[in-house]
Amino acid sequence: MIKKILFLLLIPFLGFSQNIDALFSEKGEIYFSFQYDTKNQLNKLSEIISIDHKTNADLAFAYANQKEFTEFLKTEIEYKIIKKEAVIFTNNSKNNWNYYPTYQEYIDIMTAFADSFPSICRLHHLGTLNSGREILIVQISNNVGQKENEPSFLYTSSMHGDELAGYILSLRLIDYILNGYENNQKLTDLVDGIDIWINPLANPDGAYAGGNQDVWSATRYNANWVDLNRNYPDPEDGPHPDGNSYQTETNIFLGLADSVNFSISANMHGGAEVCNYPWDTWSNLTADDNWWQYVSHEYADSCQTNSSNGYFNYLNDGITNGWDWYSVDGGRQDYMNYFRYCREFTLELSDEKTPNPNDLNDLWDANYPSLLNYMEQSLFGIRGIVTDSITGNPLESKIEITSHDVDSSHIYSNLPIGNFHRYIYQGNYDVTFSKNGYYPKTINVSVLNNNITVKDVQLVPLNTTSITDQIYTNIKILNIDILGRESKKGENNIQLIKTKNGRVKKQIKLN
């Protein structure tokens, strides 16, 4: 039986003598709405408060901590506080992923995944917060833990602690993949071909702000009342765009992105139903805007097909450019794309941030084909291995599409394999491979959507001639006649090739 207790109270505060300390006495964040005149005004406000989502052309919703709200008050914009009381669902059964686990249950579930499928699943403890709660991630691959010629793929969810649809969908996705391996061909192909990483809960302090037993008092911000999705280095605004130090959660994921060269990723949120693709921070379109629209529509269209009418059709039929929606500075999506050369978009999975548990099965049915399809995209596009033409050693090479790439849309091949994975909309492209100390190489490549184009490339070192000279200086060639005497003419005689290590090779020379 489901019982829902108390929802939202709208409380107008039209005067500006509000006691700020009292307003934040119970919780370090508030939720409020306000009207705005222009998109430019909304984007300016986004620099001081955390815009959540807007329901129409002139009404916005936002979060703020005490410092942020104090700045907002200086604008003298009228607002309404939305008092979010605990929403409690009582569910007597815990079957088929229709519930929110306690924190300890979450730990146990993640541990059980790795224990039950040790040959294809590994649990990584990325870090521990001051609260003692952990950031966990599972890695899934047919040769888990080994570096292979395959893309690395990342799903994370709930960096906003009260946006929990993706939390359950991620857990269920892990379970579905592990149990389907070698029983379902698509799942088997994904596990065999991709290095899969899934983090269901990126902000456990926010999710379990009310205690480890339930998520009904979850908060958007972390325990320090910082919005983690405004806390990353930004392409336009540089380091610390929110004015805060990098949080422990942020540093954990910065470290993960440094250690694993992810090719594609997605960041799961809630509060709307839409695919949000880059950029968030500025109005520039990415070099691969047509590819982003293609994969975003693929996700949204599949959700619509596998759900009841009205799901996942927000904004542009379920997709939006981030900046066109509202500007975000310090978001993880832009960080991953610009600084880590990884294709990441943001999935807003549910209008309800913490959906009724009875709705979780419907959300799964609508989203799991899309989640798998997006994962499969990491196998497509242009891929190959870059090596040294002399030694055959793998190289970390810059890979750039001529007259196409801009704003850090190029990529690099990854050591220790030298593999690269470049995702791009179908067409013909000139692709340049370059590295210091090597001659650049440009090749023409034809690409089809949802297809693989393999191009292995060898780069020639700039000092090829000197290397050859060094090789031949180790060789001494003598021309001798049939009696063993040295011959100056070098005609119709025997060559004795003597190397410095003392070995002699005999070769008969006939003219």
Where are these regions (language model features)?
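A short, amphipathic beta-strand motif
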Residues: 382-389, 457
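Residue-level detector of functionally pivotal "anchor" positions at catalytic/ligand-binding pockets or at interdomain
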Residues: 390, 458-487
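Sec-dependent N-terminal signal peptides
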Residues: 4-14
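Structured interaction patches on ligand/partner-binding surfaces of diverse proteins
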Residues: 436-461
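Active-site/substrate-binding loop(s) of hydrolase catalytic cores
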Residues: 147-297, 301, 305-309, 336-349, ...
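A short, solvent-exposed beta-strand micro-motif common in secreted/extracellular proteins
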Residues: 426-437
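Short, acidic Ser/Thr/Gly-rich low-complexity loop/linker segments typical of extracellular
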Residues: 393-395, 401-425
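C-terminal tail/sorting-segment detector
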Residues: 494-511
